[in-house]
């Protein structure tokens, strides 16, 4: 699985967090890749939807000063009766508004990086990976497999440095990119969102491909931890618990 040379070299991330304790064993450095095909109704990272960079707007921080209105070449920002209106359809993501917003209401989300740049940042935490161990890099998103070529290059760079690798995934992808990263991934954190029949309502996608990919990992004896964002009244159903019990008995 080779892919375009440009896509192999560059990727889009929207965050890199140090000293993470909930994204796999030990102390982790978590890299968040942009782009996700799911639209989970409880999503707390909507800025990760698009693979390209985006402009986020936090209304609660806006003072209505109008600085963004003055610099936006597309007139995507307007002040109407003292309130800020952001027309996303007109926005070309030039970022001019974020540079003049002194209240932090407008921010540019996402940056283009190489695998080497990411690993250079990850290596700064190497001392913390050794004790208590086995810490390392966790690649999250978004959906990391939405950038398959960059993901593989990033995992390979980590393995070349002897760094433990962990991939957090929804499992929604073709089988080929998943199979390509299996030899490079020490641990899969596989997120299941709810019972199979409820997937279209909960996430906007069907569950068949997701469970087929989970089956691939289980059959190949990969190290898999199934994780669930348990939300009362939404996905805490007896049917879902029954499906999970069957899967856990296989591990």
Give residue ranges: language-model regions.
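Hydrophobic packing within well-folded, soluble alpha/beta domains
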Residues: 40, 62, 68, 72, ...
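N-terminal pre-core extensions flanking Radical SAM catalytic domains
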Residues: 1-12, 30-31
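Fold-independent oxyanion-binding glycine-rich loops
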Residues: 16, 34, 46, 88-89, ...
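Conserved AdoMet/S-adenosylmethionine-binding subsite of the radical SAM
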Residues: 116-251
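Short gly/ser/thr-rich secondary-structure transition/capping motifs
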Residues: 12-14, 80, 168-172
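N-terminal-biased segments
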Residues: 24-25, 32, 49-50, 54-59, ...
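N-terminal pre-triad scaffold of radical SAM enzymes
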Residues: 14-67, 84-93
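Iron-sulfur cluster-binding cysteine motifs and their immediate structural context
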Residues: 41-48, 67-86, 96-111
């Amino acid at each position: 699985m080779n892919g375009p040379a440009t896509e192999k070299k560059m990727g889009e991330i929207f965050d890199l967090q140090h000293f993470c304790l909930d994204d796999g064993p030990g102390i982790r450095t978590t890299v968040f890749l942009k782009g996700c095909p799911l639209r989970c109704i409880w999503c707390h990272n909507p800025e990760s939807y698009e693979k390209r960079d985006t402009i986020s707007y936090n209304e609660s921080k806006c003072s209505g000063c109008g600085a963004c209105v003055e610099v936006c070449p597309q007139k995507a920002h307007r002040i109407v009766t003292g309130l800020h209106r952001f027309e996303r359809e007109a926005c070309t993501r030039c970022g001019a508004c974020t540079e003049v917003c002194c209240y932090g209401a407008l921010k540019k989300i996402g940056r283009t990086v190489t695998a080497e740049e990411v690993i250079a940042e990850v290596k700064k935490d190497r001392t913390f990976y050794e004790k208590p161990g086995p810490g390392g890099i966790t690649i999250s998103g978004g959906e990391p497999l939405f950038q398959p070529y960059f993901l593989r290059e990033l995992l390979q760079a980590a393995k070349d440095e002897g760094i433990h690798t962990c991939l957090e995934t929804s499992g929604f992808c073709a089988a080929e990119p998943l199979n390509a990263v299996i030899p490079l991934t020490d641990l899969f954190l596989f997120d299941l969102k709810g019972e199979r029949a409820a997937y279209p309502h909960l996430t906007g996608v069907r569950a068949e491909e997701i469970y087929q990919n989970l089956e691939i990992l289980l059959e190949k004896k990969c190290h898999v931890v199934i994780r669930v964002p348990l939300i009362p009244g939404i996905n805490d159903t007896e049917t879902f618990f029954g499906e999970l019990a069957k899967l856990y008995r296989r591990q």
